[in-house]
């Protein structure tokens, strides 16, 4: 990956912006500059403290962790002490929590027992998502600036041998209503870094994500965040170095604010993929993405929808035929460098045969999309094109707007591929179709 002066300058700015202020009980006040779609509840005060014990010899500390959580639940704070390492070798269901803080000052490390985790991690019922733990309940905060390490290298190597293995997600936020996550350092997740499911009113603030493979086997599917069946989520002030979506809004994600992120090496900030499962209805609406720097990536703004016919992106990712809608999506203010597509909208996800895709157009509509205030330079890999907006039918896309898109290829071109979309609403230079 090339490091430009633009990237260096932006990283310097992001280093200041991505460090969350001291933990605040007022989640609403912590959100800046944009405010969430709906007010976030304030966290109640805590009146007792429990310190988690550690064996200190590499043994599983899960029982100590559960003991502290039960002891300080309903109004306390659980502390993972600085300069201590806590080993987790047991799948932990922590969805019983209420009015509790987890202050992570030290390091939490998951074991590399791949057989155990494949058999015992929590199956989340979407794609192949499984999680090391489930953190949920009401008014739960996890912060402190410490490190959570997923021991991912063994998983990267194993996945290269068998792409059907179940790789755990590092942070399973499942059924949480009211919470603040961060600041934290997340390292070497086997798969996604966050899976946020059936949750609401959660703020992620000051998350530092990194974890590249140390072998020839890539760290794949390491999304920064995937939201699923969740509402009123804020993700802000974070730095993400990964190998897949920086943030992905999965089915039935609503009222999501993402702001002040630096994403490096990713697949962009993505709506979807959606419409993967036949006879299921997927909805993503009311999403605002603001002030993003995106470097060394495949995309910046991305909307990916499966067509109306079965398709296969890979052996472990197949689908098509679902219905639903994408509505009221805004991408506002982005700086890009070495990104393949500044904008990529497709209703043919997983289907390389455009003719077949058009014969079986997606049943999932895209409308009321606003993309504005982009600047920077693409990678040139799609030269002369810098973006693509391809719908499977003019009946399935409407009210897609772009404005102030100042993005060029390294050769100075700024062409777009446009299909089945109202070009009069686009400020970009549509010069080709996907045929």
Curated annotation (Swiss-Prot):
PbH1 repeats lie at residues 199-229, 230-251, 253-273, 326-347, 361-409. Residues 1-22 form the signal peptide. Keywords: Cell wall biogenesis/degradation, Disulfide bond, Glycoprotein, Glycosidase, Hydrolase, Repeat, Secreted, Signal. PROSITE patterns: POLYGALACTURONASE. Residues 31-55 are annotated as: Disordered. It is found in: Secreted. This is Probable exopolygalacturonase X. It comes from Aspergillus niger (strain ATCC MYA-4892 / CBS 513.88 / FGSC A1513). The lineage of its organism: Eukaryota, Fungi, Dikarya, Ascomycota, Pezizomycotina.
């Amino acid at each position: 990956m090339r490091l430009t002066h633009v990237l260096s300058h932006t990283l310097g700015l992001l280093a200041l912006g991505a460090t969350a202020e001291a933990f605040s009980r007022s989640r609403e006040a912590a959100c800046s500059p944009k405010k969430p779609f709906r007010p976030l509840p304030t966290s109640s005060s805590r009146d007792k403290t429990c310190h988690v014990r550690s064996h200190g010899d590499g043994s599983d500390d899960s029982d100590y962790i559960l003991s502290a959580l039960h002891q300080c639940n309903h109004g306390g704070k659980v502390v993972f002490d600085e300069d201590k390492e806590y080993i987790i070798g047991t799948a932990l269901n922590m969805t019983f929590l209420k009015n509790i803080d987890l202050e992570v000052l030290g390091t939490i490390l998951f074991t590399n027992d791949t057989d155990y985790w494949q058999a015992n991690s929590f199956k989340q019922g979407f794609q192949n998502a499984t999680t090391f733990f489930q953190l949920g309940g009401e008014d739960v905060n996890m912060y402190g600036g410490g490190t959570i390490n997923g021991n991912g290298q063994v998983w990267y190597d194993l996945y290269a041998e068998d792409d059907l293995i179940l790789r755990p997600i590092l942070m399973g936020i499942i059924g949480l209503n009211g919470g603040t996550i961060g600041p934290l350092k997340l390292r070497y997740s086997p798969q996604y870094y966050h899976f946020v499911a059936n949750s609401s009113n959660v703020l992620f603030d000051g998350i530092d994500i990194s974890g590249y493979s140390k072998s020839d086997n890539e760290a794949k599917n390491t999304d920064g965040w995937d939201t699923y069946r969740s509402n009123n989520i804020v993700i802000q002030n974070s730095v993400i170095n990964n190998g897949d979506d920086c943030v992905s809004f999965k089915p039935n994600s609503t009222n999501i604010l993402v702001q002040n992120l630096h994403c490096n090496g990713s697949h962009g900030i993505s709506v979807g993929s959606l419409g993967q499962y036949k006879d299921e209805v997927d909805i993503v609406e009311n999403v605002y993405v603001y002030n993003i720097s995106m470097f060394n990536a495949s995309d910046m703004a991305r909307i990916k929808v499966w067509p109306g016919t079965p398709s296969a992106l890979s052996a472990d990712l197949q689908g098509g035929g679902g219905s639903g809608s994408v509505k009221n999506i805004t991408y506002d203010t982005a700086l890009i460098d070495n990104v393949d597509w500044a904008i990529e909208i497709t209703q043919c996800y997983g289907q390389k045969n455009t003719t077949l895709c058009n014969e079986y157009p997606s049943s999932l509509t895209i409308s009321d999309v606003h993309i504005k205030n982009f600047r920077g330079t693409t990678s040139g890999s799609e030269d002369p094109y810098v973006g693509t907006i391809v719908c499977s039918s003019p009946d399935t896309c409407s009210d897609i707007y772009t404005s102030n898109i100042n993005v060029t290829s390294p050769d100075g071109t700024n062409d777009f591929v446009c299909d089945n979309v109202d070009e009069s609403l686009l400020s970009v230079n549509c010069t080709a179709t996907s045929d």
